[in-house]
Regions:
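Membrane-interface segments at or immediately adjacent to transmembrane helices
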Residues: 39-109
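Solvent-exposed soluble domains appended to multi-pass membrane proteins
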Residues: 101, 105, 109-116, 121-201
């Protein structure tokens, strides 16, 4: 829920509890309006878990594809509820899936979101090629920083290591990224950025 929605719900709740006459019932529409702000939040286009081992791509219309694997069952269920899907579509095993608009091979996947080409790369060799042709890159592997334009790299293994799970939304002005670290805030035990790192990791 957006911060504004939480504030509206809180105000409505206080109104409902403090007042004792019939006017207190006017707080109910206020609380409802606060909860309705959830509908204003665009669902993430791509979600990546805290170790990069689980990826979900939101196709819209209640359809989502998730990377294969038997682990991360709790996260899978949580993501399905968050994206309001009963069951994800199968992850393309090879070639281009015309229905999902996603092309995958063992080195990663490429898709189009908001009119831009997005590559999710798990192989260093493929990363070099995708860094030349894709508009945005999500690196699930390490490569030398000089081989990929920083402006194209939305997410790297270093970001995942430092910030945990990521939710990415693509729009006309480019991608916006929400991380689990932002939600929990900085803690004494949180990992911190090391600008001296030689690799995108």
């Amino acid at each position: 829920m957006p911060t504004a929605g939480l504030v509206i719900v809180a105000i409505g709740g206080i109104w409902l509890c403090v007042l004792r006459n019939r006017i207190r019932l006017c707080a109910l529409p206020v609380i409802t309006a606060g909860f309705m702000t959830i509908l204003l939040v665009k669902a993430p286009d791509i979600i990546i878990n805290r170790d990069g081992g689980l990826v979900a791509i939101n196709l819209g219309g209640g359809r989502v594809v998730m990377s294969p694997g038997n682990g991360n069952g709790f996260e899978r269920d949580m993501w399905q509820r968050r994206l309001a899907v009963e069951s994800p579509d199968p992850w393309p095993s090879g070639g281009i899936d015309r229905v999902s608009r996603i092309g995958c091979d063992p080195s990663g996947c490429i898709t189009e979101i908001a009119g831009k080409t997005v590559a999710i790369v798990s192989d260093p060799v493929s990363a070099i090629e995708d860094c030349r042709r894709a508009d945005y890159i999500i690196l699930l592997t390490r490569i030398p920083r000089r081989l990929c334009d920083d402006e194209r790299v939305v997410l790297s293994t270093f970001h995942i290591w430092r910030d945990g799970a990521h939710a990415i939304r693509f729009g006309p002005e480019g991608p916006t990224v929400e991380t689990s670290r932002e939600r929990r805030g900085d803690r004494p035990w949180s990992r911190v950025s090391d600008k001296r790192r030689q690799y995108i990791e």
